[in-house]
Each structure stands twice: as C-alpha cells, then as structure tokens.
C-alpha cells in the first residue's frame, strides 16, 4: 500500500472505514440492550399501515427508560469510532479529513434513523447526533497513536 496513489488510497480508506462502521454499529446493539435490560423492539410488519407502525414505535420508545438508550447511543458511536479508526489507519496522509468523512456518513445514517423511527426522545437524538463527529475525531487520534505519521 505504500506505493499506491495517495488519492486512490484515501478513497479506499474511506470505503473501508464506511464498510467497517456498519457491523461495528450493529455489533454492540444487542449485547448492550440485554445488559441494560431494554425490552425487545417490536417486530416490523410490512403489511401494517404507516399510522399503526408509527403508533407502535411511539409506544415502544415511551416504555423505555434513559438507561435503555445507552445501547443504541454507544453502538452508534462505536460505528463512527471504528470507521474513523480504520480510515485513519489506511489513509495516505494521516489527515483528519478522511476519518471525518466516514464519521459524517455514519452521522447521515443517524439523522436518517431519527426520521425513520418516530417517537425517539429528543434528548437522545440530540446527544446521539452531536456525538458522531467528536467520536470520529477520537478514532482518528487513536489511529495516529497506533500508526504515527512518519
């Protein structure tokens, strides 16, 4: 990888970070949900009318306590962290741009999640969305420690 074109290497770093971020996000979701005692999320019924599905999700989120939101919060941030870490390790110039782009893609997923699942607590959404880029920055800082700039 040392003789590769830097632009191509940075594109590859961004793609690798984005690919790693998805399973890293999902990896913690179920274990943290069990750890906090969160009730199982309702099953998705594609035949149900949208209003019924929205009511089910709102009732589900209303039944949760603040501690139950730690699982989704930490798993979302884990995706941004791991994706930025991988991008930072692979990127040609060790700059912040590629890891933050990866964290930004994960942030876009978090914003989409806020619109797709109705009834999520506003405080959770605010903390969740505000955390993606700082956690991506932390992933980049760890990448610099693991593989410092030559």
Task: Please give the residue ranges for each predicted region.
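Juxtamembrane/disordered regions of integral membrane proteins
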Residues: 3-150
């Amino acid at each position: 990888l040392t003789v590769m074109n830097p632009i191509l290497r940075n594109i590859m770093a961004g793609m690798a970070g984005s690919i790693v971020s998805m399973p890293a996000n999902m990896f913690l979701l179920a274990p943290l949900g069990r750890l906090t005692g969160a009730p199982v999320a309702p099953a998705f019924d594609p035949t149900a009318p949208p209003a019924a599905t929205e009511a089910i999700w709102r009732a589900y989120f209303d039944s949760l306590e603040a501690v139950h939101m730690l699982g989704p919060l930490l798993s979302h941030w884990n995706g941004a962290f791991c994706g930025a870490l991988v991008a930072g390790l692979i990127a040609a110039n060790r700059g912040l741009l590629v890891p933050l782009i990866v964290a930004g893609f994960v942030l876009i997923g978090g914003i989409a999640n806020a619109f797709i699942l109705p009834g999520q607590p506003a405080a959770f959404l605010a903390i969740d969305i505000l955390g993606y880029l700082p956690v991506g920055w932390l992933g980049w800082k760890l990448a610099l420690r693991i593989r410092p700039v030559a």
